Amino acid sequence: VYVACSSLCFSRYPLADALHAISELRFHKVDLALHESGSHLKPSDVVADMNRVAQMLRKANVAYAAFHVQIEAPDAEKYRDTLRAVCRLGRVLAVPLVNIPAAPLGADLSEEVTRLTSLTRIAQAEGVILTVETHSQSMTADVAGAAELCRRVPGLGLTLDPSHYMVGSGPCQDYDPLFPFVRHVRLRDTTSNSLQVKVGKGQVEYGRIISQLYRERYQRALSVDIRDTFEPEGPMEPEVRKLKYLLESMV
């Protein structure tokens, strides 16, 4: 198990500066966001010229633990073509895993199983693992729903973002049943009122999460994912460093 850093920690920087900041903090791997509405790389950039994007990412002198992907496409076919290009980029850069969002809350389960089965095959053809993230606004908002998707879609994994099971008026959801499906993890500190708080001010049980992952023989990334869009008042580096050191002391 190793600690990686999300490029979303530094989304206010140009991408080259963000990757440099992550490298300066002595992370060896980056959880790279490719969001169509984001300020860094977009999936459409990859479709337009994959070789140019690959060259640019190689120049940064960091390795990539995962791609965190949000595609905006007019139809299912265009979505598949875009995902295929991103997965191909993953193969070229030896990125093991590509994450996408599951369908929004309230979507039809069998339709989503069909969609994700097709997308998982695309990823597998390029030699990468496809995951969906646990998120309060998607079908994975409910632990049972997330587990059901993974059971019904062969080869699909989960990116565990435990914050989304902690926020809200009800008690924190027990997400232990999901650990067998987890292929990637994103962490920040969280309370029931706020998705992101300063490290040490929240209730995320990092030690328990790590011991559950070890039980499943997990050997992948724990990604520091503190968004600079949440807490604009302070510099990001001290917070990111604090969580990095905390996680490294546990693995």
Where are these regions (language model features)?
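Histidine-acidic metal/acid-base catalytic patches
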Residues: 1-7, 12-28, 51-54, 58-61, ...
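A generic secondary-structure micro-motif detector
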Residues: 8, 42-43, 76, 109, ...
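Active-site acidic/histidine proton-transfer and metal-coordination neighborhood
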Residues: 16-17, 56-63, 69-160, 166-167
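Flexible loop residues that form catalytic
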Residues: 35, 72, 103, 190, ...
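Active-site loop signature of alpha/beta-hydrolase-fold enzymes
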Residues: 35-38, 137, 165, 193
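Metal-dependent catalytic neighborhoods of phosphoester/phosphodiester hydrolases
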Residues: 41-47, 76-80, 110, 233-234
